[in-house]
């Protein structure tokens, strides 16, 4: 219905409805008595019909939708950057375990160190992946 209303709209109707588009939707609807015509379209004081009300509603809700989308981007990016802190905790755990393992069995120094480097690389990769997702949410969407 909305697509049909956008196609049936004339430029004169848009100009007539643009004066009211600056008012909040509640003030525009409540301040005019509504009457029904025979064709089923709504007329407000003989100058506006349902099509101009749809145009007005679209004009006023796009700013709200844009603000909601921006807030959702920031919330998602903030949640994704929590993974970077998890990466730091993982690196600390890996090297803490390396020190404990070396204290228990010093003869396994080379094998423990290679496992620690592998754990460091995996933990750092996950942190960088979380940071990349945060930047993608902010700048690519």
From Swiss-Prot:
It is a multi-pass membrane protein. The modification N6,N6,N6-trimethyllysine is found at residue 109. GO terms for biological process: proton motive force-driven ATP synthesis. One of its GO terms (molecular function) is proton transmembrane transporter activity. Trimethylated by ATPSCKMT at Lys-109. Methylation is required for proper incorporation of the C subunit into the ATP synthase complex and mitochondrial respiration. Its main location: mitochondrion. The keyword ATP-binding does not apply. The keyword Zinc does not apply. GO terms for cellular component: mitochondrial membrane; mitochondrion; proton-transporting ATP synthase complex; proton-transporting two-sector ATPase complex, proton-transporting domain. It comes from the Eukaryota. Mitochondrial membrane ATP synthase (F(1)F(0) ATP synthase or Complex V) produces ATP from ADP in the presence of a proton gradient across the membrane which is generated by electron transport complexes of the respiratory chain. F-type ATPases consist of two structural domains, F(1) - containing the extramembraneous catalytic core and F(0) - containing the membrane proton channel, linked together by a central stalk and a peripheral stalk. During catalysis, ATP synthesis in the catalytic domain of F(1) is coupled via a rotary mechanism of the central stalk subunits to proton translocation. There are three genes which encode the mitochondrial ATP synthase proteolipid and they specify precursors with different import sequences but identical mature proteins. This is ATP synthase F(0) complex subunit C3, mitochondrial. The gene is ATP5MC3.
């Amino acid at each position: 219905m909305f697509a049909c209303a956008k196609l049936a709209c004339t430029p004169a109707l848009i100009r007539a409805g643009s004066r009211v588009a600056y008012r909040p939707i509640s003030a525009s609807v409540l301040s005019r008595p509504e009457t029904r015509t025979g064709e089923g379209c709504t007329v407000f004081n003989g100058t506006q019909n349902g099509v101009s009300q749809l145009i007005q509603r679209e004009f006023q809700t796009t700013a709200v939708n844009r603000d909601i989308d921006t807030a959702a981007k920031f919330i998602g990016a903030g949640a994704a950057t929590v993974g970077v802190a998890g990466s730091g905790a993982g690196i600390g755990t890996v090297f803490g375990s390396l020190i404990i393992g070396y204290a228990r069995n010093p003869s396994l120094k080379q094998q423990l160190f290679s496992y620690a480097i592998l754990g460091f690389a995996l933990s750092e990769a996950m942190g960088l992946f979380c940071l990349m997702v945060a930047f993608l949410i902010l700048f690519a969407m």
